[in-house]
Amino acid sequence: MDVVEVAGSWWAQEREDIIMKYEKGHRAGLPEDKGPKPFRSYNNNVDHLGIVHETELPPLTAREAKQIRREISRKSKWVDMLGDWEKYKSSRKLIDRAYKGMPMNIRGPMWSVLLNIEEMKLKNPGRYQIMKEKGKRSSEHIQRIDRDVSGTLRKHIFFRDRYGTKQRELLHILLAYEEYNPEVGYCRDLSHIAALFLLYLPEEDAFWALVQLLASERHSLQGFHSPNGGTVQGLQDQQEHVVATSQPKTMGHQDKKDLCGQCSPLGCLIRILIDGISLGLTLRLWDVYLVEGEQALMPITRIAFKVQQKRLTKTSRCGPWARFCNRFVDTWARDEDTVLKHLRASMKKLTRKKGDVPPPAKPEQGSSASRPVPASRGGKTLCKGDRQAPPGPPARFPRPIWSASPPRAPRSSTPCPGGAVREDTYPVGTQGVPSPALAQGGPQGSWRFLQWNSMPRLPTDLDVEGPWFRHYDFRQSCWVRAISQEDQLAPCWQAEHPAERVRSAFAAPSTDSDQGTPFRARDEQQCAPTSGPCLCGLHLESSQFPPGF
């Protein structure tokens, strides 16, 4: 038996063991896998959303009691809308009531109608069961799914027990979707989205809700989880235009401090809508998003900029990503009704100015072929040691998304020993990123370039073993090879030896020791201190960069 057969049998046995644990139930796991110890009685420790608290809850306040009475009174109005859906599905009254709040016992039926789940079930009878069984037999990422399921909504009473009923349903949904949509496959965010659906929908309905959320043109979430990335880039360009128009001082400071693009709120928008705020506000924002569609993304972004305008103007280059994410979360640490009130006002203002949705995507933006990365204001190469090219002339909005021919990076000066300075022009690599290795004739494996399209853990242009990994975990894989002294002195040496530079340009590239590493083994590696900055946190001190950055 060769190595391939041994590895295949080992993966099959591992997959069967995981499936068997979920089939046995919450008593099947090991002691360390059981999670938090469940309470014997949940009578006084569970709030109205299902969150289990460590201590007994205090009595209801007058404000909470008033909110409960208001929700009960609104239930009859929502029932009337569901009874005459054709009349209200495109009405202003539906939008107004969505911002005021959707009753919890109406949320499940309303989500089902908004996502057209019943029609999908009628068109695909038995499809979910087929995909689920196929995923159990052939899923290549069941270990990652199992790990993410174990950490999803563990404070909720539905998902508190390890290998419990809801965790088993969540595993089945993610396995089935991995087989149903191979282009997206599995991403970590999908476990949180599917868990929210499972709070109010049955298992099969939650699966089709996930399918509709990513596939429907109204919501366009697949752009955040596919290699095409059209949704991400369109929203990124629109966000830069809207913020520059409404808050010019804020955007000017962002440009000056090189914080635009990579540190935009779109970078953590989906993450915050899932796992960054209280469950009550999360559900209300998802209600608005399901009713409004893609138009709700820009108002949420605009509110974060407007509320945090004073803090953003004080944000420095040191650790910008971590600071911005924390302040974006702090935006929602307030009353839910106040947040929705500001969101509605922002939605109306952007609609009047026609800035609530990005311009239509270019034809190339939806293609699956490898594409050059569009130039954005303040866009920087994120690898440690890369020289920063001087900014070009400001572009008008809307800017062209793709170029007709591969561009060339602007010139940058290279300091040499003795005070000499030489101008370099780096040709753009296959992924649209300026590649010093190609210009210098050095080994291509000595540099790793990662172009970040504003969304964490979703790299679309990774120049290692293919253009894109659909299951790539950004936080565990964002390491960069340290730059050796030979790499730093290579430009100066090649300037003095032009013949060697030409000869080395046609030489076969040397292999990188990391390129042969299996994907799963590399995914488990942590960011070493000597391997450069971790791109997911972007804690980049100014002293870590060369003078030309």
Swiss-Prot record:
The answer to whether keyword Transmembrane applies is no
Region of interest called Disordered, as start-end residue ranges on this chain? 350-425
Q: In which tissues is it expressed?
A: Expressed in most tissues including pancreas, thymus and testis.
Question: Its principal location?
Answer: membrane
Topology in the lipid bilayer? Lipid-anchor
* Subcellular localization: Cell membrane
Which Pfam family would be a valid example here?
RabGAP-TBC
Any further remark recorded for this protein: TBC1D3 is encoded by a collection of very similar paralogs with multiple copies of each paralog, some human genomes encoding well over 50 copies depending on ethnic origin of the donor.
Question: Protein name, please?
Answer: TBC1 domain family member 3F
Source organism of the structure:
Homo sapiens
